[in-house]
Amino acid sequence: GSARDAARAVGCELEQIVKSLVFICDGAAVLALLPGNRRADAAKVAAATGAFGARVARPEEVVAATGFEPGAVPPFPAPHVVGTFIDEALLTHEVVWCGAGSERHIMGLSPLEVARVTQAVAADLAEEA
């Protein structure tokens, strides 16, 4: 269930796939939404959230924060995250493709709609290419 598989399935570019990643920032779970072709930079995630540090959540923390297994996390709903952050690069597309709660389901949305529904803050979250 990789971003690459998802891009192939819907016939879009990898950068239009939304990866939903849970980070633990100063003990609280946050959701970072990144393009499928980029890796999250933990230092940038921490900076965006105003936290001292950020680390990738462990699998059990992902489930606790979102109710979903790692790899199947949709951008919403995320009942126990304190905030959602969207990488600015995603906002440049007309349509992005998000996981919809399982590795087999995917939905296309405007990135502005994703940001609105999740009340996401736009930030630079990705490692330099």
Describe each region flagged by the PLM:
Residues G1-A129:
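Extended, low-hydrophobicity, polar/charged segments
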